[in-house]
A protein has these predicted regions:
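Short Pro-Cys-Gly-centered "Cys-loop" motif that presents a nucleophilic cysteine in a tight turn
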Residues: 1-3, 10-124
């Protein structure tokens, strides 16, 4: 997935546009500085969809978590459990990332942490 990323966000009062502008501009400036280049880094504007239904949230989690498998970056589900650039490794408890809201995601899959992690992995 060298040419794109999937990010599932809860938008705040400032809205998604302001956050994405800061994120993408900051990344482009940092990347250009590190690689001694200038100009645009991204080809198009980001794409966003609104998730208003509970069932759709779970489907989005599954779609995003399985993307490294579909792209051939992780060859099996056990390898995906350890893949560092996907939230799946956080949900199953293999890694911790400050950017991943593990507890929020787990709440959708069960009442206890252990049960939720197991159910989420099974769902994926």
């Amino acid at each position: 997935m060298a040419n794109h990323a999937h990010i599932l966000l809860r938008s705040g009062p400032a809205g998604l546009s302001a956050f994405m502008r800061k994120l993408l501009t900051g990344h482009a400036v940092n990347y250009n500085r590190r690689h001694h280049r200038h100009g645009h880094l991204f080809q198009n504007r980001y794409k966003s969809i609104v998730c208003e239904e509970d069932a759709y949230f779970k489907q989005l989690v599954r779609y995003i978590h399985l993307n490294p498998l579909r792209a051939g970056i992780a060859s099996t589900l056990p390898k995906l459990d350890w893949y560092r650039w996907c939230g799946h490794s956080c949900v199953v408890g293999r890694r911790e990332h400050s950017w991943y809201a593990r507890e929020y995601v787990l709440r959708w899959f069960g009442s206890t942490e252990k049960e939720s992690a197991r159910c989420c992995r099974h769902f994926v």
